[in-house]
Amino acid sequence: MAATNKAELLAIALKEYDALSKLIGSLDASVATKANDEGVSIKDIVAHRAHWIDLFLGWYMDGQAGKTVHFPAEGYKWNELKRYNADLRVQQVDMDWSDVQAALHKGFLKLKAFVEECPEDKLYGGPMKGANNAWTPGRWAEAAGPSHFRSASKFIRTTLRTAG
């Protein structure tokens, strides 16, 4: 069930980030950078999650400023996420494992600060400006943060189980 207020959103964000952080904290770079059969590594997944927090914050700021909000990013449509994610992996190829972990932590802190500073009515009082759907900024924040943290943890556990 999706969070419906700031307190719930902060609680689920902290819970899911802590779980992911503990999971990746013990992984060394050789494990994190080993690609699976589809060419995707744990490092790729974690870097992707950090990136999507910045995407969300950019969408929010663009909407607040009355700018065009590019979903998911300029030059891409939602049905082109595979291409977007592949292009993102190419852009992030030179990030090492410690850089990725730091980017995730920094992203979490930015998301947490956004939620803490955003008034409740701005988070859950109506659709996010520029989003062209009914999702509130709080729901978008949950999708970019806690939901992505949870799916990354699941991917990592599956990857480790399959490898071991």
Regions found by a protein language model. Give the residues of each.
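Extreme N-terminal tail/first-helix region
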Residues: 1-18
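A short, mixed-charge helix-start or loop-turn motif at secondary-structure junctions
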Residues: 2-6, 89-94, 134-138
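Residue-level recognition of alpha-helical structural elements
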Residues: 6, 38, 67, 93-100
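Short amphipathic alpha-helical segments with heptad-repeat character
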Residues: 10-14, 46, 50, 98-101, ...
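Short, contiguous alpha-helical
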Residues: 11, 35-83, 123-164
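Structural signal for well-ordered, non-membrane alpha-helices
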Residues: 17-28, 53-57, 61, 105-119, ...
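Short, charged helix-helix connector/hinge segments
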Residues: 29-34
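Acidic/histidine-rich alpha-helical segments that form the ligand environment
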Residues: 80-124
